[in-house]
Amino acid sequence: MQYAPRMPRVLGVVFLLLAACFLPACAIAARPADNIDSAAQVEIAQAVRNVYPALVRIYVVINEPDDGRMRKLSGAGSGVIISKDGYVVTNHHVAGNAGRIVCNLADQEEIEAQLVGTDALADIAVLKLDLASRKKGITPVPVAQWGDSNAVRVGDVVFAMGSPAAVSQSVTRGIVSNTQLIIPRNMEGSFRLDGENVGSIVRWLAHDAIIFGGNSGGPLVNVAGQIVGINEIGLGSLGGAIPSNLARSVAERIIADGHVKRSWTGVEVQPRLKDAVAESGVLVAGVVQDSPAQAAGIKSGDLITSFDGSAVDCSIDEQLPLFNQLVLGTPIGKKVEVKLIRDGKPVAVSLTTIAREPALPRPEEVKSWGMTARNLTRMMALERMRSDKDGVLVDSIRPGGPCGNSKPGINAGDVIRKIDGKCVKDLAALRELSAEATKGKTDPVSVLVDFDRGTGGLMTVVKVGKEEPADKPALARKPWPAAATQVLTRDLAESLGMKGKTGVRVTEVYTGMAAAKAGLEVGDIILAVDGIKVEASQPSDADVYDTMIRKYDVGAEAVLTVIRGKEQKKITMTLDAPPTPSDRLAKYEDQDFECTVRDLSVMDRIQKKEDQSLRGVLVERTEPGGWAAFGGLSGGDVLISIDSVATPDVAQVEKILKAAKQSKPRRIVFFVKRGIHTMYVEIEPDWRYVNH
């Protein structure tokens, strides 16, 4: 079966608050669409011929931390094939956090893909199409060619290609209005992806080829039919593309290494002050503690004029990304010379770069704690005034989960330092210590937790593990009416010609139960039980008749005085024990598939008007954002089989799902009955998040 994506959200970055930032340095009006001459038609034809076949519409399932869980969300974006091996370039914000990726080519062929690597700082991700899954004899995938973004000029005609709003591929035409589009420093925090300031290294190509949400990741193409940018941002008719030279460099490094390695020095810079005497150089705004720059003696107020032999200059914000690219692109561990101006005098220092850490490590779900959490980086530790990066940063908490129920409760933003007196270095250590504490235990285990909140240190006790429901006391076996009724109110009695009468009216008789066997019918008015009046005349008396029946023993006979039509008659009913309540039936909650099922009750079958021979289990609930819900399973469904194996009870469901966690199939097919309909529900788990 083919992957059938759920209703996608369209992935696109739209700067609603940054409209003023996109004022082009030089604007030229686009040629009206209804006045395209023959030369323009040739340009369009060439661009479309060279790139359009290589367009890719991308559907993704991404995992995002929320309420102590990694929730699944669907999304859609665009991309372009850049090699015969099936490599696809798109944006990080489209596919960088994807657990499942499916691509539709321009000819509507559908191919699954894997994430090769991603770079949030440049907002570039690379996918690889699963070409081995294609049918034999099919033609090679079309490939688009890179162009030189440095050759792009204001006024150049360009074409934005992609899949706006997740619809089929499209092309729009416009011109370049700015080749150095940036976000001003006072608004740089407005565009961060996974903590990374994208604008620190990117100068966008601004253009007015119309783009919408869903165009993200699609190519910006010149008249020669070459990729000169990867579309990323949009506001109204103004779009911004990552220059192809930067995108290509990042993509090639991802293909080679799976990620982008960058150097870090710890120097933070800004353009020279307006009253600066110096005519060149980059102003050092600050130096990070314990960084290579600090070790080299670089100070705030220094002007860097040369870095590793390259002259540098920055008098305006537009020049900052070039300096950052130079520093970040230096080989890790290289000793470089930095020339400075300090107090008007030249100074030369040397420093050795170190590897740059990501701004934010990826979050992970720790189900036994009811939280999502992530490791700390050097910068995260410094910003939190911590002496080292040991510990685990709590990202979100599941309400009612182990962390949420602790006193004092652990909150998002807290840093877990110790478990039972043992240091927690990172998430791996937390998992290991948790496993040690719960080994061989079936009930939750209380652990002593040291954690930091701000600059204060707190302690709490967390019950780690799954909380089992408390045993419920046995129910007394008392009979039930085996029928649904309504109170014979005064108004209803008068309307039915029974003024002054009290009792209940039968609204439903449960098939196969005592009332049905006795011959009770819908519409009967029950006035008395064994000669005792049913004193029910207002809505608050709804339980009067039921209470009268429960006073008898199971198996006893009760004579009902009934009015049917205009005739009064006696009906003898042998009283039965009520069916087992739903909360007393076998139940199974799967924390990985995030759904709860239970055995079907007699009342389930009655209320759903199902034949008593129906074999299956009831899906009691699915967790929003879980794999079951994302695949389309819903609370109220009757689960009949899994992968063609019948599921007559919850024990069988548990057995099948536990076996699936060992074999890890690509897909699991649930056959369900929903109302009068039956359907197949495909669930495609991301096994990386199972048993965590």
What role is predicted for each listed range?
Residues G12-A25:
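Bacterial N-terminal signal peptides
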Residues Q145, G297, G409, R417-C423, ...:
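Exposed loop and linker-edge segments at protein-protein interfaces
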Residues V681-H692:
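Short, low-complexity, Pro/Ser/Thr/Gly-rich segments in the mature regions of secreted, periplasmic
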Residues R374-P402, C595-F630, G635-L639:
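C-terminal accessory/binding modules appended to enzymatic or scaffolding proteins
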Residues P408, V424, L430-E432, A437-K439, ...:
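C-terminal soluble interaction/assembly domains
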Residues G301, G413, G523, G636:
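Conserved catalytic motifs of ABC-family nucleotide-binding domains
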Residues M1-F15:
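Bacterial N-terminal signal peptides that target proteins for export
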Residues I28-A296, S300, S306-K335, I341-P346, ...:
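Serine-dependent protease modules
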